[in-house]
Structures are given as structure tokens and as C-alpha cells.
Amino acid sequence: MGTDPATDIALLKIKAEKDLPIVEFGNDRGIRVGDWVVAVGNPFGLSNSVTAGIVSSIGRDIGGGAYNDFIQIDAPINRGNSGGPTFDLRGQVIGMNSMIFSPSGGSVGIGFAIPASTIHDVVAQLQSKGRVARGWLGVEIQSVTPEIANSLGMKENKGAIVANLVPGGPAAKAGFEQGDVITAIDGKTVEDSRDLTRRVATVASGNTAHFAVNRQGKSQDIAVKIGDRPDDKVAANTPTPPAAAPAVTGNAMGLGLAALTNEQRKQRNIAAGGVLITKVDPSSDAADKGLQAGDIVLKVGSHAVKTPAEVQAGIAEAQKGGHKSVLLLVATQGGSRFVAVDIAA
């Protein structure tokens, strides 16, 4: 009847001549670390195999996608267990076996189950619409790391910082800006970027959500009419011919800097401003944070820059303000992101 690759869930319709036995779904939100669970499956073709263990962790992020929040269990599961139920001791399904972590391919006591609440939400949409519609804000976001929080003068490293806006998207229309830190949605605290993505996804397209935003130290409330998330498509980067390395006209924090030429702006689709990183000292904090030659500094703090001197001035201003690190908005080949770099590095 429908599939949802983002969560690895499919809804099947079975034709049967008689009523089939069913199981009852439970409330996975009530489980705790240490609770006993039972996993059922067909490991290596051995049907109706049952194993037992405990909940090792909840809300586990293993890079399986923005919409999955796995239950980690230590009940032995192997290849063939995927799709089988995970029961609590009341006999209710609290999850569906999904994958294992194993260097050898066999069970090492680290398995993951998709929570029953996720299954319920996805199946309801597959049954009614044949697809899963997710709310869309139209932003590229990052989690607020301790370094980013320090550079912004924030007390807590919670929330999601807006690195880029989709032109014409819901957030852009509502007045969001690069550098805004989203701290809550509809009154509920946002822990990190993944939390925000999941929460926005649950808002129906056309509904309005209210976002608490920290903009340059000031709190704002922004109301956004949520859009329907478009199909995920990977935008291919058009290869550009290699250009001669520009002369270094400035240095800061282990970075060689040069002003962008109009041709370079055109190649990278940058409307105005920007300072090219021409080299990175491999022993610098900038290198540790993943900055590379060819990246482009768009902002230092909240100020757009177009010359190496403006980058240096922004760093000096942050240092004068007592900050140990400075926040850079950097355009890379993969998109825009914020990077907090130690000033002393």
C-alpha cells in the first residue's frame, strides 16, 4: 500500500481466507533503559526465533536518517530479524527490529528497533494517502555546539542555527535570517538540529508553527506557515575548471585569505562579498574544524565580509568582546555551515 524509505517502513495488504491473529502495539514512550524486551524474527532462515534482552538506550541516533530515533537493545538479533517485532513483557509491540551494529556480521549485543510510535505515525499516512507527507521549513541547519554557543554568548549549547535559507521557502517568506538560532517550536525546547527536523516534520503542511529565535542576542517569535517537504533530490555540483591560486592578501587564525574575483563568485553562485580561503595551516584549530582551501568566508559573527581586512577586523572585534572563538559562516562545496574557530589558534 505504500513505503517510506526515510524510516525503512512499508505497509502491506494481505489477502486471507480467515481472520489472522494480531498483536497489540504498546507505548514506546513509556519504556526505560534497563527494561526487559523480547525480539522475534527469522535469523538465518530459522523462523519464529525468540531472544531476550534489555533496553540499552533510547532515542539513539546512528546516522540512519533524520526521522529515526532508534531503541537500542541487547537482545541477540541477526540477519533475518529485520522487520520482526520487539515486545515488552506485557506482550505489546514497542518496536520493530531494524538493524544491528556488528564488525563481524553476527550479533554482538547491539541491535536497533524502530519505535512503535514512529511506525504508528508512518503507517497511518501510508494507509490514508499512500505516502508520508512531512512538514518543511526550508532551511539548512546545524546543532549549536559548545563552541558556537560560546562565540554567540549563549549560556546553553541547545537549539539549531540557520546556516542557509531556501529562496522562496517557508522560512525565507516568514523573515528568517542566516545566523538565527531556533530555540523552541510551539513552546517546546529544541535540543539540536535533528530534534528540530523531526518536530517540523510532524507539522502538517499549511499549518502555522511558532518558532522562538535568538537573533544577535535578542529573542523573537516568528510564525511560519509550514510547507510540504519536497522529494529529496541531490543537487549535483557542476565541475568548474581549475583556476590559478590567487595571491594571499591576508592571514588569520591559520587561514590564508584572498578577495574573491567576480568570476569566482559566478562559479560558486555567490551574489556578493565573500573571502576565499587559499590555504589552511594543518596544525590550526581551523583545520581541526574541517575548513579547507577553496572554502569561502561569508560572515564573521553577524557581519558580511568581502575583504581579508574585514575578516581580520571581525576577529579583532570578537577578541575585544572577550570571546575565545569567533563564528564564521562558510560556503563549502556541500553548502553553507557555521564554524566556531578558536581565536588564539
Pin down the residues of each PLM region:
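C-terminal recognition in membrane/secretory proteostasis and scaffolding
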Residues: 13-16, 32, 93, 118-345
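A generic structural motif
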Residues: 8-14, 73
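Conserved beta-strand positions that form and line the central face of beta-propeller blades
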Residues: 22-24, 70-72, 76, 161, ...
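Short acidic/glycine-enriched loop/turn segments that link adjacent beta-strands
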Residues: 5-8, 79, 334-335
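Active-site substrate-binding loop(s) of clan PA
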Residues: 1, 14-46, 78, 124, ...
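Active-site loop architecture of trypsin-fold serine endopeptidases
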Residues: 19-22, 40-54, 59-134, 193, ...
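Residue-level recognition of beta-strand microenvironments
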Residues: 1-3, 28, 40, 58, ...
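Short, positively charged
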Residues: 6-9, 60-68, 187-188
